[in-house]
């Protein structure tokens, strides 16, 4: 995808001489030149305006009106598009979602302050001259020269206050509540990679070092970062590549679906990265974080922090300490497995509905939803950690009243993780603090509810820091229940909280009462009963008289404005009172804002304690949801050990059973991996019989067990798996030019090269994407290799019934089938998995059910009979394996 500036080169700001632009647009271009690859939102009064190429992009992407503005005599009219200041977050969210970086340029003084600044500058310069010398241009802070001949032409000072990129947003409207918003950074050295990622809205900050590009790509696909930082040689300090946009700076091995931001290589130098990280976290060494000897990870982390310092423009980002991890700590799920198992979204339409997350998510808070999502994508290997989660689910399973009580409380808890982050960064608004206060006041009820609990995750909430309870009380006492979004216009602080504020409010009430009395007095004095006292921002307070009564206006009334139906007047007395009221209101608003700021800073000092409690509440919420699912859908607690067994009694698919009417799902057993049990099951049966559902079911039960959840079965004993592999279905990869069969073979090769005896492998229809004989040969060889060389636990679903012969020539292989019942005119799918191999696939019956013409069905039966009569594949395989076995014995 081309850079927007070159895409819309007619209006590229670099094409215009600055001297040809109006002073305001000179200021705009000055800022734009510092951020050429970002969309610049430039505050003008009540709007954020965009100009030139940016305006065309914003108009197109946001579907707002494209207007124009005079840019100067030589240039004429240029494109302009604006958004109201109160809708900034909503529109920024849309732009960021589309992969743009956005620069916010705000007014840092009022027009009145700008005029006063110009007046004082003019006086100062004249005092240094003889009074007759011409005025000299004044050099502004941003380098622009303006001739101050009149205060009316003064430019208001503006400054960049935020640089918003997809991975650096904090505002609620710019985030998805139940998903983390990760910013990642990468550093490469040979085959190795350093990876750092952070969610600045929650403070999470993790690093790792990976031995291959393949491992890196799998981690990126798990994390789904909103933005990935790369070191590059681009001349601009921030170049953002939108999804799919080509660049020689992005290594070919990296997925093109993410936003990549190119940053200068100096940000990723080891010494500078180490210094910056130690300074950020106030430590003398990185050893305590476990990454001192991981130079690539340290470099990536340093580049990430430097990026935050530049984009946040003075906003403090309170990241938690660095956590170092390795892939070997978790059950590894590659992207294809996560996709095939539909963990967080369906393959068909990418929706959450119909996914495992949909079936399990009963969380009451968004932070609990994020925790559950992370757990599903990164199951555990440590049986002790798994057991701690299981113990908590078990207690909440057994104690139904406790679970329901906790969930009722949790329904009133807001996103403590992100609220804490906004308090720590100083960006929280008054409604954030109200939500924080309400949430903190729920914590004592949670602590009381779990006071007698014995499981670890519940016990963690038995003690709430006293300072957080006090903070919650203070927030409730100080702030009104529904404060305004704008912090500088008053209405934030409750009555009776601050003596000085109460005195100022009392004076305002007296002055406004005076206005009411003035209206009554003037009506009586003039005899004009329709006379009113009004106010607007342009003219302040005025006396309004209808046009028909205007001749009765006293001579001391000074006409200020004439409208269609009324005349508006002022008096010296009214203007004097107006000045008093407006000054008092401004002082009152400022005092309220000062009180709010002190309160926000106090909350920010507790960010670490807030986040610690938030993580505990999120975990409790996720576990309570898992317990609720277990109760309502009759799940059991699995037994996990260090063996290799997969013993599932009456297992069910957790998603399908919720998507169909209750009682319709047919449970099935699975036994493999232990002594005297097969390592590999050849699963045959008709189309539509449920083979694919069964193999996914086994994988999901294994995964849920290692998450620490209960599982949909009557009983389950499972050995911990180090990896789960699935190869289920395939489509052409048009982006890389790979056919369906090539994709299938690539995925199969990945499994054969990485599976271990502790892995769980689920294969469906290997070899079906090519000629029958080739496909059968590959399927046989793959199954044989898994059974005899890797000896991992495998279920191999196939329509190649000849593979049933493998059990007679390779040890550790067993045949199972999904049964049907044949009636006179149709077949009934029983969906029951039983020992033995099927000898028919009933594909023609499925075609008949799908509506194939009767003549086609009849012809297919004839052809099938001829093929079966002359096929000697099974005999040949049996003979060749028998000969091979005899040769090996000899």
Swiss-Prot record:
Q: Which Pfam families match?
A: MutS_I, MutS_II, MutS_III, MutS_IV, MutS_V
Protein task? This protein is involved in the repair of mismatches in DNA. It is possible that it carries out the mismatch recognition step. This protein has a weak ATPase activity.
Q: What is this protein called?
A: DNA mismatch repair protein MutS
Molecular functions per Gene Ontology? ATP binding; ATP-dependent DNA damage sensor activity; damaged DNA binding; mismatched DNA binding
* UniProt xrefs under SMART domains: MUTSac, MUTSd
Keyword set for this entry? Answer: ATP-binding, DNA damage, DNA repair, DNA-binding, Nucleotide-binding
The protein's superkingdom reads Bacteria
Give the InterPro entries listed for this entry: DNA_mismatch_repair_MutS (IPR005748), DNA_mismatch_repair_MutS-lik_N (IPR007695), DNA_mismatch_repair_MutS/MSH (IPR017261), DNA_mismatch_repair_MutS_C (IPR000432), DNA_mismatch_repair_MutS_clamp (IPR007861), DNA_mismatch_repair_MutS_core (IPR007696), DNA_mismatch_repair_MutS_N (IPR016151), DNA_mismatch_repair_MutS_sf (IPR036187)
Query: Which CDD domains does the record match to this protein?
Result: ABC_MutS1
Q: Which SUPFAM superfamilies match?
A: DNA repair protein MutS, domain I, DNA repair protein MutS, domain II, DNA repair protein MutS, domain III, P-loop containing nucleoside triphosphate hydrolases
Similarity-based family: Belongs to the DNA mismatch repair MutS family.
GO biological process terms, semicolon-separated: mismatch repair
**Gene name of the encoded protein:** mutS
Q: Does the keyword DNA repair apply?
A: yes
Q: What cellular component terms from Gene Ontology apply here?
A: cytosol
Q: List residues binding ATP.
A: 685-692
Q: What is the lineage of its organism?
A: Bacteria, Bacillati, Cyanobacteriota, Cyanophyceae, Gloeobacterales
């Amino acid at each position: 995808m081309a850079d927007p500036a070159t895409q819309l080169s007619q209006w590229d700001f670099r094409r215009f001489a600055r001297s040809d632009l109006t002073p305001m647009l000179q200021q705009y271009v000055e800022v734009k030149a510092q951020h050429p690859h970002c969309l610049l939102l430039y505050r003008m009064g009540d709007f954020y305006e965009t100009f030139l190429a940016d305006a065309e992009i914003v108009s197109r992407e946001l579907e707002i009106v494209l207007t124009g503005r005079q840019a100067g005599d030589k240039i004429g009219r240029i494109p302009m598009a604006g958004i109201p200041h109160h809708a900034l977050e909503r529109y920024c969210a849309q732009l960021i979602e589309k992969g743009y970086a956005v620069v916010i340029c705000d007014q840092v003084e009022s027009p009145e302050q700008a005029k006063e600044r110009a007046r004082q500058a003019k006086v100062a310069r004249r005092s240094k001259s003889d009074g007759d010398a011409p005025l000299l241009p004044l050099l502004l802070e941003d380098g622009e020269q303006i001739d101050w001949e009149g205060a009316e032409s003064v430019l208001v000072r503006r400054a960049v206050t935020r640089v918003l990129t997809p991975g650096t947003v904090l505002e609620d409207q710019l985030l998805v509540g139940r998903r983390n918003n990760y910013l990642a950074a990468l550093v490469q050295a040979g085959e190795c990679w350093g990876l750092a990622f952070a969610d600045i809205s929650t403070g999470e900050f993790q690093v790792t070092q990976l031995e291959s590009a393949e491992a890196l790509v799998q981690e990126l696909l798990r994390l789904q970062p909103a933005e990935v930082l790369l070191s590059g040689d681009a001349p601009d300090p921030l170049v953002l590549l939108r999804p799919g946009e080509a660049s020689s700076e992005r290594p070919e091995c990296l997925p093109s679906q993410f936003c990549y931001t190119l940053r200068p290589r100096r940000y990723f130098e080891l010494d500078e990265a180490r210094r910056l990280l130690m300074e950020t976290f106030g430590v003398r060494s990185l050893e305590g974080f476990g990454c001192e000897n991981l130079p690539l990870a340290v470099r990536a982390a340093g580049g990430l922090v430097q990026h935050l310092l530049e984009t946040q423009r003075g906003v403090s980002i309170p990241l938690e300490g660095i956590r170092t991890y390795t892939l070997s700590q978790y059950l590894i799920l590659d992207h294809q497995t996560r996709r095939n198992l539909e963990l967080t979204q369906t393959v068909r339409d990418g929706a959450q509905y119909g996914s495992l997350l949909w079936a399990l998510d009963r969380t009451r808070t968004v932070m609990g939803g994020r925790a559950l999502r992370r757990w599903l994508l990164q199951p555990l290997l440590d049986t002790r950690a798994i057991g701690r989660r299981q113990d908590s689910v078990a207690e909440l399973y057994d104690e139904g009243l406790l679970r329901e009580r906790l969930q009722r409380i949790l329904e009133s808890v807001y996103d403590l993780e992100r609220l804490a982050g906004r308090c720590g960064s100083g960006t929280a608004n008054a409604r954030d603090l109200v939500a924080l206060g309400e949430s903190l006041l729920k914590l004592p009820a949670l602590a009381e509810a779990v006071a007698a609990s014995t499981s670890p995750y519940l016990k963690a909430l038995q003690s709430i820091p006293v300072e957080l309870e006090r903070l919650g009380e203070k927030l409730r006492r100080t702030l009104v229940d529904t404060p305004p979004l704008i912090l500088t216009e008053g209405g934030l602080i409750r009555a009776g909280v601050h003596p000085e504020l109460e005195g100022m409010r009392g004076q305002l009430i007296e002055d406004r009462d005076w206005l009411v009395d003035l209206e009554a007095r003037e009506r009586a004095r003039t005899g004009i009963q329709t006379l009113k006292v009004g106010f607007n921002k342009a003219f302040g307070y005025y006396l309004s008289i209808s046009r028909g009564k205007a001749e009765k206006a006293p001579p001391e009334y000074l006409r200020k404005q004439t409208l269609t139906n009324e005349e508006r007047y002022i008096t010296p007395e009214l203007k004097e009172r107006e000045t008093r009221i407006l000054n008092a209101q401004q002082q009152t608003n400022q005092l309220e804002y000062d009180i709010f700021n002190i309160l926000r800073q106090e909350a920010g000092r507790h960010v670490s304690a807030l986040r610690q409690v938030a993580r505990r509440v999120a975990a409790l919420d996720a576990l309570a949801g898992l317990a609720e699912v277990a109760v309502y859908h009759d799940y059991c607690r699995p037994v996990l050990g260090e063996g290799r067994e997969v013993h599932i009694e009456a297992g069910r698919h957790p998603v399908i059973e919720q998507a169909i009417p209750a009682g319709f799902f047919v449970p099935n057993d699975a036994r493999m991996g232990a002594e005297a049990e097969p390592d590999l099951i050849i699963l045959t049966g008709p189309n539509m019989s449920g083979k694919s559902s069964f193999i996914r079911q086994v994988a999901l039960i294994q995964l849920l067990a290692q998450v620490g959840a209960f599982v949909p079965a009557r009983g389950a004993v499972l050995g911990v798996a180090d990896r789960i592999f699935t190869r289920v279905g395939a489509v052409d990869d048009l982006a890389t030019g790979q056919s369906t069969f090539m994709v299938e073979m690539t995925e199969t090769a990945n499994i054969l090269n990485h599976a271990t005896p502790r892995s769980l492998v689920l294969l469906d229809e290997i070899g079906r994407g090519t000629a029958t004989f080739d496909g059968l040969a590959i399927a046989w060889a793959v199954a044989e290799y898994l059974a005899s060389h890797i000896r991992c636990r495998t279920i191999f679903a196939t329509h190649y019934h000849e593979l049933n012969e493998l059990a007679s020539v390779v040890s550790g292989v067993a045949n199972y089938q999904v049964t049907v019942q044949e009636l006179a005119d149709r077949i009934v799918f029983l969906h029951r998995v039983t020992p033995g191999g099927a000898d028919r696939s009933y594909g023609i019956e499925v075609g008949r059910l799908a509506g194939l013409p009767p003549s086609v069905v009849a012809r297919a039966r004839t052809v099938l009979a001829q093929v079966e009569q002359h096929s000697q594949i099974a005999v040949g395989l049996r003979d060749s394996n028998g000969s091979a076995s005899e040769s090996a014995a000899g």
